[in-house]
Amino acid sequence: LTGAGISAESGIATFRASDGLWENHRVEDVATPEGFAHNPKLVQDFYNARRARLHDADVQPNAAHIALARLQQALPGKVTLITQNVDDLHERGGATEVLHMHGSLLSVRCLYCDSVQDNWHDDCSTETVCPVCKRAHGMRPDIVWFGEMPYYMNIIEKRLANCTHFAAIGTSGQVYPAAGFVALAREWGAETYEINLEPSHGASKFQHIYSGKATVEVPRWVESMLN
């Protein structure tokens, strides 16, 4: 499981500031269905700016993304990457199967026909026409907002029940259901690891805790898993 901390060293700011604001916006205004209904232009502009940021030259996968992709490649079919992040740095770092439980900046969804358009690199607005049903005023960011059900939960729960090792990397340990994954994994007998800049709120639930930069600690942990 990876969170915002793994992408921080790639120039993607951790979304939520200490004052609870998201890039100077209230969470309710830019990350809820109600906020989108109230002011769709504000919400579209907010995510358009974040999507555009992914295309900046200085935003590149870092050593932690690359190390996890290497782990996946070394153990084909045995490593599931679940991320709370909405960027594409895991994929650009070489990862193949990534479960984006909170959606992706690079996909948009139609409220009318529920179709999802992947590899969406352009801006999206209320005027954007759905390529499938050809209606306007219905395209929204394919992001899981507060109050919405995260994606892939059935798959994730099955993988947790069958895993032998579970690691949470760069996560706050405060956002559910992801914060509860460690308890599920331990219940089923997995060895558990937390890798964070500093111990998270849920660090006591893990058997092994590594503190430091993701670009240092993750490659080191991957080496230990492969040896």
Where do the PLM segments sit?
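Conserved catalytic core of sirtuin-type NAD+-dependent deacylases
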Residues: 1-227
